Amino acid sequence: MPIDRERILSLFGEIQKALSILKEFQKEKKEKIIGDLKVLGSVKYYFIVVMEGCIDICHHILSREQWGVPESYADGFVLLGEKKIIPIKLAQNLANMAKFRNLLVHLYWKVDDERLY
C-alpha cells in the first residue's frame, strides 16, 4: 500500500501545533517551568504529543514500505535513518527523544525535570 500522504500531513499539523506551544514555554524562565506543576505537566504533555506524532509517522512509513516492525520506538527512527528516509543525525536525535518519551510515560517519577527545559 502507498504511504497515506493525508495522514502524514495531518500528523505533521498536530506536531507543529504542539511545537508552537512548547516554543512559547521556552520563553519562560526555567524556575517558572520547573516550579509550577501545572506548567511542567503541560510541557511534558506537549512533548509526548510531538513524539507520538513522530512515532506514528515513523511506523506508518515502516509499515507501508514493509520494512518490518522495530523492537522499540527508538529503533524505528534508526531504521528510517538507515533507509535514508531521514538524515542519520535526525534519526539519532529522534531515537533519543523516543527513549525520553518512554521515561516520561512509564517511569515518570524518575524524570529529571531539568532535562525538559
Predicted segments, located by residue:
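Solvent-exposed interaction patches of small proteins and small membrane subunits
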Residues: M1-Y117
